[in-house]
């Protein structure tokens, strides 16, 4: 299918989902500044409705032909539409996690939602950005709002430390990425748009030069920081531990979605001439991420730091699909990413609920939770087991498909490392579950003894519990419907114009 190019600013409904969110953001500002609404909960409702509307628009757009619009700077195809849906889905699941957290910590609701929606808009634009300037501006839109969200609890010393580290590392990574872009700009003869850069590298015969390889390395390093790939992961545990937990939940997934979408587009449009080089670099990084992330996670005593290293290992698994580099590999990466959204956010939702009721984040303090809150214990255990890849949960089927696609491509060593490290992850997840289900009174902590019992009603007024129920149901049943999900993805991904499939 030929790619339709339209140089008008708006073409049909290409950026309508983002426009809906921008309109929502402006509406919240006006309502807060002019009308001064006392019941701030209406802002959560407006945000959720706008995000749902954006997702519905993107779903209907899947039937449309790929097109480049926005003055040639934005490409809309089914690949980036799926990733834009995922980012909006993350925001929808994270907003309920934030409602009770913001109320308990007495933070400003309006500013929090503005930063969250702006980060969502930046991530969605990043998925379809078609030139270097749009990529960089979208990335900074996501990054700057992430810094503000990380330091949102200004009176918390750990939060201030986290945002300072995040800001310094983020600024460094953006500078490195911009330097890589400058090499592409120079080598291609002064081009900005991705396809024109690729054509320029061919016309100047620089596509296989040392300069192109240097640009590739700097771009991988710059995006590697955003994705928490080893060895660019050092900031992740400290930022996860110090930032507000709902913010960590959002960043742990949304940044990965946007970063992966950007990597796939860059590698397939700009660097199709250097497949061996970027395959090798990403394969080494994926192996290191899986091994180091899981090994260090075993030693952690903080639940958030443990999940930080777990997320490092998870991006290593997702890299397997990217390194596979074919149609099945990208499909398996998207399938696992979908499952990861629910099982990871479900885990964070459980941690937020426990933290609000006890004020602790220590893994040992979860001991004996089943005696006071069986529902939370059951939910956290299922999400952790799904992250570990235990059958018949969604995480198992996602990893199985991911490893199978890599095996068919001949990435045997990568699959072996993935299987080995998955076993390691099951070990430390089971350690936590063992603490949760202990019934010996002497091992039950004081935090659990004073714990407020949660409601078992599915109609609970607690928004966090609603998110937990949604994520747990998805973590259980999405894997059962994996074949229809794969078929739907494959049908829609065949409409791509940039992937070499």
Swiss-Prot record:
Q: Which Pfam families match?
A: Ndh2_N, Proton_antipo_M
One GO BP: photosynthesis, light reaction
Which spans are transmembrane here? 15-35, 42-62, 82-102, 107-127, 132-152, 167-187, 210-230, 244-264, 278-298, 307-327, 334-354, 378-398, 410-430, 466-486
Keyword entries, A-Z: Chloroplast, Membrane, NAD, NADP, Plastid, Plastoquinone, Quinone, Thylakoid, Translocase, Transmembrane, Transmembrane helix, Transport
Q: Does the keyword Kinase apply?
A: no
The keyword Translocase is assigned to this record? yes
Please explain the role this protein plays, according to its UniProt record.
Answer: NDH shuttles electrons from NAD(P)H:plastoquinone, via FMN and iron-sulfur (Fe-S) centers, to quinones in the photosynthetic chain and possibly in a chloroplast respiratory chain. The immediate electron acceptor for the enzyme in this species is believed to be plastoquinone. Couples the redox reaction to proton translocation, and thus conserves the redox energy in a proton gradient.
Tell me its family.
Belongs to the complex I subunit 2 family.
What is annotated about its quaternary structure and interactions? Answer: NDH is composed of at least 16 different subunits, 5 of which are encoded in the nucleus.
> What is this protein called in UniProt?
NAD(P)H-quinone oxidoreductase subunit 2, chloroplastic
- From which organism does this entry originate? Physcomitrium patens (Spreading-leaved earth moss)
- Originating gene: ndhB
